[in-house]
């Protein structure tokens, strides 16, 4: 993997910097590195593809070295370099695709394709010029079963979940009380509602709670907490739990009271926030508990009192909500996030070449399925294919 990264980095630099008119002295170190790559690769043969519709391709390396000059690089020099660069780039692209479509239930962190296994040999270590990528560093750590750490922006840590629970219900569905939520990606939105606006509740207050368990521990997380859940702020028709009927939800938004957020790790509270909104942080956690209250307004203007009558029918439904967004966090496991395209890169290649479903990943690389059942085998394989995708993205956008 180190060699593949170094190949890609060298080729990217060569493609960007070996251009007509450049002073040789400005790129002499790069050309020396480029020539070392050629010397190491010459005389070797590789084969890629042969899975799904990914075609089999054979690769042979027999290239001349780039020479030295006291002057600027001319058109002939650059053309010679370009021919070599283009072949190597095509090779790296195919090695990456070949690796991204393979998976293994055992030791999935290790190279799986014949070409990358061969590149892992000792004879190619002379190409290992650079090891600065976060993905490469973590791949090496994971390969040695040491602790890794990825920094994510808006990590896709929550499997998609959208549902409701009713704490009070009737066959007519005309006086409901309960909770709705939508968990997806890096965001939780939860709303508590009471058609009667807590008219008969103790102290005219309804208590709500929403608990979310993460599939992986997050650390040093920066989080945004808002006293609103905009996705539940407009009317909608909802199918009943048994699917036998539908019921009408017509929210009127109130501000939640006594908001408390707890971040827990292995059942122990690590951080707690009460009535604090905006930016908060959590040190390390695997569970989030949100609790909040709907309180009937003690004083109401006639217009507000008309919204919340003391008896049925209840045409407007008192609603309070919270939004929690994980803006950034560190995780020992690789995740899809908002700042990178690794999941899309891997999935698109597997779809384009009709790669059959293997023993590890779900059909279509369904992220909700993958993260819901994030086994050690999936973690190893995902870290490997994401690392390869990061290498490929240096050359192929």
UniProtKB/Swiss-Prot annotation:
Variant or mutagenesis effect after changing residue 153 to S: Impaired homotrimer formation at pH above 7.0. No effect on transcription activity or on VP2-VP6 interaction
GO molecular function terms noted in the UniProt entry: host cell surface receptor binding; metal ion binding; structural molecule activity
Post-translational modifications: The N-terminus is blocked.
GO CC terms, sorted: T=13 icosahedral viral capsid; viral envelope; viral intermediate capsid
Keyword Metal-binding: yes
Superkingdom of the source species: Viruses
Keywords for this protein: Calcium, Capsid protein, Intermediate capsid protein, Metal-binding, Ubl conjugation, Virion, Zinc
SUPFAM superfamilies in the record: A virus capsid protein alpha-helical domain, Viral protein domain
Subcellular location: Virion
Positions with a binding annotation for Ca(2+): 266, 286
Region annotated Interaction with the inner capsid protein VP2, chain positions: 62-73
Binding locations of Zn(2+): 153
Main location: virion
InterPro entries linked to this entry: Capsid_hemagglutn, Rotavirus_A/C_VP6, Virus_capsid_a-hlx_vir
Protein family membership: Belongs to the rotavirus VP6 family.
Physiological role: Intermediate capsid protein that self assembles to form an icosahedral capsid with a T=13 symmetry, which consists of 230 trimers of VP6, with channels at each of its five-fold vertices. This capsid constitutes the middle concentric layer of the viral mature particle. The innermost VP2 capsid and the intermediate VP6 capsid remain intact following cell entry to protect the dsRNA from degradation and to prevent unfavorable antiviral responses in the host cell during all the replication cycle of the virus.
Subunit organization: Homotrimer. Interacts with the inner capsid protein VP2. Interacts with the outer capsid glycoprotein VP7. Interacts with the outer capsid protein VP5*.
More info: The VP6 trimer contains a zinc ion located at the center of the molecule. The zinc ion is not essential for either trimerization or transcription activity of the DLP. Zinc-depleted VP6 has an increased sensitivity to proteases.
Protein name, entry field: Intermediate capsid protein VP6
Organism this protein belongs to: Rotavirus A (strain RVA/Cow/France/RF/1975/G6P6[1]) (RV-A)
Origin organism lineage: Viruses, Riboviria, Orthornavirae, Duplornaviricota, Resentoviricetes
């Amino acid at each position: 993997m180190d060699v593949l990264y170094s190949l890609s980095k060298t080729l990217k630099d060569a493609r960007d910097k070996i251009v007509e008119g450049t002073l040789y002295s400005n790129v002499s170190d790069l050309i020396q590195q480029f020539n070392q790559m050629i010397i190491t690769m010459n005389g070797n043969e590789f084969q890629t593809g042969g899975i799904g519709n990914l075609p089999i391709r054979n690769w042979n390396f027999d290239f001349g070295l780039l020479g030295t000059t006291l002057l600027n690089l001319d058109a002939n020099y650059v053309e010679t370099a370009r021919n070599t660069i283009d072949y190597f780039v095509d090779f790296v692209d195919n090695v990456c695709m070949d690796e991204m479509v393979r998976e293994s239930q055992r030791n999935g962190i290790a190279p799986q394709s014949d070409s990358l296994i061969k590149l892992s040999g000792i004879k190619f270590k002379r190409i290992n010029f650079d090891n600065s990528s976060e993905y490469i560093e973590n791949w090496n750590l994971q390969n040695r079963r040491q602790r890794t750490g990825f920094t994510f922006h808006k990590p896709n840590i929550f499997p998609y979940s959208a549902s409701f629970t009713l704490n009070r219900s009737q066959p007519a569905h005309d006086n409901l009380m309960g909770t709705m939520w939508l968990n997806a990606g890096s965001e939780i939105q939860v709303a508590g509602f009471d058609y009667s606006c807590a008219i008969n509740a103790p102290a005219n207050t309804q208590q709500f709670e929403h608990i979310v368990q993460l599939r992986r521990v997050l650390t040093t997380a920066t989080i945004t907490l808002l006293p609103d859940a905009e996705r539940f702020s407009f009317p909608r028709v909802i199918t009943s739990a048994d699917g036998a009927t539908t019921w009408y939800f017509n929210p009127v938004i109130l501000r939640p009271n006594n908001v408390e957020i707890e971040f827990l790790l292995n059942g122990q509270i690590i951080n707690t926030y009460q009535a604090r909104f905006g930016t908060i942080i959590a040190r390390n956690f695997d569970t989030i508990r949100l609790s909040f209250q709907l309180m009937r307004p003690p004083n109401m203007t006639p217009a507000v009192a008309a919204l919340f009558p003391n008896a049925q029918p209840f045409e407007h439904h008192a609603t309070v909500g919270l939004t929690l967004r994980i803006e950034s966090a560190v995780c020992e496991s690789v995740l899809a996030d908002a700042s990178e395209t690794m999941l899309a890169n891997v999935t698109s290649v597997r779809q384009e070449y009709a790669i059959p479903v293997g023993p590890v990943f779900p059909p279509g690389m369904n992220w909700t399925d993958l993260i819901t059942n994030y086994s050690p085998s999936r973690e190893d394989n995902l870290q490997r294919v994401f690392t390869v995708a990061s290498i490929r993205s240096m050359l192929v956008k």
